[in-house]
A protein has these predicted regions:
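Conserved acidic segment of CheY-like receiver
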Residues: 6-27, 60
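C-terminal output helix
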Residues: 21, 114-123
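Short hydrophobic/Thr-rich beta-strand motif most characteristic of the beta2 strand and flanking loop
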Residues: 34-43
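Acidic, metal-coordinating helix/loop segments flanking the phosphotransfer/catalytic sites
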Residues: 42-59
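Conserved phosphotransfer microenvironments
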Residues: 58-79
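Conserved phosphoryl-transfer motifs of two-component systems
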Residues: 59, 107-111, 116
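His-Asp phosphorelay/catalytic-motif detector in bacterial-type signaling
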Residues: 82-87
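Alpha4 helix (beta4-alpha4-beta5 surface) of REC/receiver domains from two-component response regulators
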Residues: 93-109
């Protein structure tokens, strides 16, 4: 019997291939004590805000390269506007952009392209941190 906590992970990118790459790299169970994951895909910034406002999302993985609304701006917006926001991870294509991730107040970064060796560990760590403070159902 597993004591793993199920979690809902929102993945945002304007590009379907990036959303698929994140889901594939992380999988349904990123660690023995984390998951299974339910994936929610969003293709627009408006969808992300609406979904997070609906409650029940544990983690958002946001593509910093998305157009027209980038994941870094969305992370900043969610931090400012949502008191009990989910954990936030932004995907960045260039390491020099890590300062932008810091500005956005994201909890973690992952490089693009997504590395299937590191992505599950980053996601699992973020979700473990959430266990004691589950999102408020609205």
């Amino acid at each position: 019997v597993s004591n793993a906590a199920p979690a809902t992970v929102l993945v945002y990118s304007s590009r379907p291939d990036v959303r698929a790459a994140v889901r594939t790299a992380v999988g349904r169970r990123p660690a023995a004590d984390v998951g299974p994951l339910t994936w929610v895909e969003c293709a627009t910034g408006e969808d992300v805000v609406d979904t997070v406002d609906g409650g029940g999302v544990d983690l958002c993985i946001l593509d910093g390269e998305s157009q027209p609304t980038g994941g870094l701006a969305l992370a900043r917006q969610l931090t400012v506007e949502v008191a009990d926001r989910p954990a936030l991870c932004v995907l960045i294509a260039r390491q020099p952009d890590r300062w932008l991730a810091h500005w956005s107040r994201a909890d973690a970064t992952l490089p693009l392209p997504v590395d299937p060796l590191t992505a599950p560990a980053v996601v699992a760590d973020l979700l473990r941190d959430r266990v004691g403070r589950r999102p408020v159902a609205r």
